[in-house]
Structure formats: C-alpha cells, structure tokens
Amino acid sequence: MIPYLIMTFLYFVVAIVAALAASFSMWNILSWIHGMVWLRVHFITLGIVTQLLFGTIPILTAKTHNLPRPKTRWDIWLLLNAGIALLLVGIPTTNKIPIITGGTLVFTATTLLLIQLAGIRTQSEKTLAVKEGRKFYIAGLFYFLIGILVGTGMFPDWAEALGIVGDIGEVHIHANNWG
C-alpha cells in the first residue's frame, strides 16, 4: 500500500504543477505548454485514482475474506508505473510506440491485479455468498480493461478493428469512467 500512496502523492503534486502550467499557458506566460490538457487528465485518473485503487483493492478484498493483509505485488506496481510513465511521454507527443507499450503494461498490471484478487478469494476458507457489490467491482475492472484497450487504440486508429462506430474518445472516456 505504501508504494502506491507515495506514487499517489507524486502524481498529485505533478497534477498541481501541470494545472499551474496550464494557467501560465492560458495567460501566455508559458505559451509552449498548449495541448497538455489530456496529460493533466491522465495524471489525475491514471496517476492518482489508479494508484489508490491498485493499493487498496487487495487490502479490502483480504479484509472481506478475513485474511491477513497481502504483500505488495512489486510486479504489478512496476508494470503499472512503467506503463503510466510511458503513456505520459506518449500522450502529449502522440508517439505510438510509448502509447502502445504503456497501454499494454497498464493492461497487464490490471490483469495481474484481477488474478491476485481471485487468488485472495480462493485462499479464504469461508465461502462468501456472491454479493452484487462484488460483481459491480469486478465489472468495473473489466470496463477499465476496455478503456485501456480503446485508449491505447486511439492513436494507431484501432477504432474499426475494435468495432467502434462514432467517436473513439467518447468510448475511451466512458469505459474508464465506468471502470
């Protein structure tokens, strides 16, 4: 949990700096920063929110099943943060290589998180009745996976291959919001 909180704080500070930079850009003090809107959005969503969720979901799942706090999965943490770093390089430059690589790493980290959560559940000796809330949170992670896939596919133009009709950006935003 602690590494995720450290990264949350880091992304929070960077998001504030990016917001200040946007203000300076708007006032033509630092005009070269135009086009960084989506970078700020992703600092908040990927940086802050994702770090908090990836850090707390395993703990809450273990607590629900009366299991000890799980150890930090450094592989998940590293994949998530390497992916975010690559996305934060690729998004403002619209470079496909860091975007696809970063999206793939975040997708892999999310998949490993789902596997970790399933493993926590199977470690439990007591069988919990399936609750609607659990289905909701599992669906949320799957929507997040869809949002990652669509967001990664925005720049290489995967819309047709993914069967998306209309604005791919809207699909990406709404999938991540539901996730």
Model segments located where?
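Hydrophobic alpha-helical transmembrane segments of multi-pass integral membrane proteins
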Residues: 1-179
